Amino acid sequence: MFSKTISLFNISNAIRACAAALALFIAAAASSCLSHRDEPEPEPERPTPQIIFLFSPGGLGDMSYNDCILKGIQLFKNDNSDIDIYIYSPNSLEESERIFSDWLKRPESNIPVLFALASSDYEPMAEEYLSELALTPNKSILLFESLKEYADPNIHTFQISMYGASYLAGVTAAQCAGGKKSLVVLANNSDGPISVARDGFLDGYGSECDIEYLADDWTGYVSAPLAYQKMNTWAQEYGFIFPVAGGSNSGIYRYSREFDASPFLAGMDIDQSSLSTRITGSVIKNIDVLICQYLLEWIHTGTMPESQLYGLDSGYADWFLAPRYKEEFQPAVTEARRVAIEKEKEYYDTKAH
């Protein structure tokens, strides 16, 4: 009987202990539910944006325009290491078309993708394929060196005008040609932006100039051996050469380093005064800075300016005199700068009408 009493007493204590524990559990659970109800729902993780750059065929390594674009990409990547960037350097326009069309055909996804067509050569290709294939909502395009405006708000264009800077190059050339004619060397006769540079130089020079084209297509940008060969004749005939031919310019600069009897020259796209003592100055494009700013705006806002023209007064284009010639030519360049800006504006106003 005694043992049973002890047993019943222990059971009673156990029941009371369980009841107390259950009450504590229910209170804790209720408190937890209230706590979670007060907390905001976590935002879904945003997919990592992707950026694709399609360079001009054979363009990378030109120590000029394309390498300056690459520098801008690197500037952006330094502070945005989480963004996926893919770079294509095709060998031909046919390969470029395949890369671009394959991308356009990809199905819609939740990943934002920007495709940068980093050459004016791609404008006809873009027009052809975009007339047949619509962009899915997650896709955007940035077309370099184009003033075309598209109805699709996800297609953006820009052009850095070379007119004003080339006008100042022409002013400089007029002072150092030494009584000889000047020569404008262009990669081809179909690329709009380089024809703008030609027109600016001719207007600044103010006299008749000869014009030569290295090719009738994009290969004029990658024909350095041909340009080097032609310098044998050009060096005898001309007092100043204004070359707008991308990587082909390296053949001209190489000749001027190897032969003393070389004409004065202009550098192109970046400061190239270190490549030859005959380079009086360079038509520069600060496209590295511009591209970095465009990419930053896109990843933060999802958009960019639709169509923009950047001229001499924007700071993205300029005529940069080589240090060895600055004292001699800076007064004339400074005096002509305001005229160059006004002429550039008139040039585009006329083209718009």
What are the functions of these language-model segments?
Residues F53, S109-S120, S140-F144, E237-G247, ...:
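Periplasmic-binding protein-like
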Residues E297-H353:
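Hinge/cleft segment of the Venus flytrap/periplasmic-binding protein
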Residues I51-G72, F76, I87-E97, S120, ...:
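Extracytoplasmic "Venus flytrap"
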Residues A28-T48:
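Bacterial Sec-dependent N-terminal signal peptides
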Residues P193-E237:
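Extracellular/periplasmic Venus flytrap/periplasmic-binding protein
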Residues L135-Q159, I270-R278:
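Flexible loop/hinge segments that line or gate small-molecule binding clefts
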Residues F158-K181, V283-G302:
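Hydrophobic alpha-helical segments within soluble ligand-binding/sensing domains
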Residues I73, A165-E208, E306-E328:
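An alpha-beta-alpha
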